[in-house]
Amino acid sequence: MDNLIIGGTEVKSRLFIGTGKYSSNSIIPRILKKSKSQVITIALRRVDITSKEENMLNYINKDCILLPNTSGARNAEEAIRLARIARAAGCGNWIKIEVISDNKYLLPDNYETIKATEVLAKEGFIVLPYMNPDLMDTKRLVNAGAAAVMPLGAPIGTNRGIATKEMIRIIIDEIATPIVVDAGIGKPSQAAEAMEMGADAVLVNTAIASAGNPVLMAEAFGLAVESGRKAFLAKLGQEKLMAEASSPLTGFLR
């Protein structure tokens, strides 16, 4: 069985979906249905979790796993506070840690992220930290209690693909904890590439939300992730420098 287990929970779809940038929350149910996604992120700073009117949570199937994120947190203390607010509001124990103090490139602060992860993991949260891909920091996050790690492929919202692929390859090779490639994936082919590399899942938001037909694009990403995973399990053929004929070059009829 090819199961993805995070924090003791089986995750059936390896495509995680973000909820930012959609023109209307009403499109979210169709996005989830077509993508077959089970894990969906919500930014606490963008959602009034106490409101009953036009609440994003009303559009999310109860079977989905909510992954609130701490977007807007500039340090560990702010991330910890947001995580506690999310759990108190009924959003569950899953939390995506985002600590960003860089306002230009929006790159995560690994040091503060590690601190927040350690505190929240001890409090019983299922912590998925968003991070700059660095092997030693990944090991520190795992030791701090991360249930999965989320290295960035490229800066948030850029659709530039997996610019950090060599660093992510190293992490995949060295870390047994689930790896979810997050940020920068702009095409279904790039999501498939991440899965072919051996990533356990990918998180996509901008590429779907900014598409001409977001619902169709969500379906395309779902298929790409499934295909990429199957390719990884099938074991890709080895690349070679020299040509190698697929048919014999001797013994032709004369």
Curated annotation (Swiss-Prot):
Subcellular location: Cytoplasm
Name of the gene encoding the protein in the UniProt record: thiG
Family statement: Belongs to the ThiG family.
Gene Ontology CC: cytoplasm
GO molecular function: thiazole synthase activity
Sorted UniProt keywords: Cytoplasm, Schiff base, Thiamine biosynthesis, Transferase
Organism (species): Clostridium kluyveri (strain ATCC 8527 / DSM 555 / NBRC 12016 / NCIMB 10680 / K1)
Pathway field: Cofactor biosynthesis; thiamine diphosphate biosynthesis
Subunit composition and interactions: Homotetramer. Forms heterodimers with either ThiH or ThiS.
E.C. number: 2.8.1.10
Record carries keyword Chaperone: no
HAMAP family tied to this protein: ThiG
Name of this protein: Thiazole synthase
Keyword Protein biosynthesis: no
